[in-house]
């Protein structure tokens, strides 16, 4: 039965309580896929968002960032083209470390939607108004917008600049062309930003190689150059000047090295097909990384080791590493399910902090990923319950996907 409904509790014709209006339909969740992807579109920097695509949030292009100066702390003359990319969550800075984790997550989604699309026969596609191929097309377009900004952020020596930032905090306003008067600068070149770049761009090679092979090879070449720079500069700290932007401080580099190495290994950058001596011992270093960086429940810009574990679990070059990674991640999935079963809200988090809904969503993503090679109804049900929390089944009675429900 399809339609919009409301549940009422009544006593002798008197309504004592009633639910919100809810809809039963085939394509509610797929519609949310397009809606959540659109949130990245609204974060685009340096381009116009026209009314036919952005609606009431339409705006002219601003913050072109195609000729910006270096921060004085870099002791560097000249200017740099850092056009494009996504704004951060709460300011008009553009950052590699958190942008990289976001784009890496979207690349995983792109990889799995390609597999899912291949599994669907023509009849199932014809009978479903939701187009997975159209979603993937939009997804790849959004991913590429950020990746092209990433490529512009790589210096000639292979290192990657940390962020683009205004010199002071902007007000809570929509960016306009007049904001060009607000001076913006490029800051730092760190080990974390460079390795984050390497991991994300190596993953991009896999996703884009059947879409645009030239762009895919450009991504892989850039990833290798970044990794080699990081080997020569293994502990260059993040820029500590945070005026006008977020710090995103992280002085632990093991997890980023693991992610970058695992992704390069997955892409076949091994001793037998790469001449550069810096890449000939990837497997040996990965074995060390696996001991240093066990998988965790979390996945964010500060803790990226799970992306390394996932890369090893999905690769097929080395079945021994694949088995080790899959077993380790299955333990994580079991821990998530156990913690959720002990929680009144069926969540695996134990603190509600800024961005904790992202932790909930990442737990669900982790369960769905691991379910692809270790199928378990408990993983699927737990992940669905976490999505229910995001979609409105929570103590504050609010859907956390803005613009998607009566209260969001």
What are these regions (language model features)?
Residues 22-26:
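Interdomain boundary/hinge segments at the C-termini of tandem beta-sandwich modules
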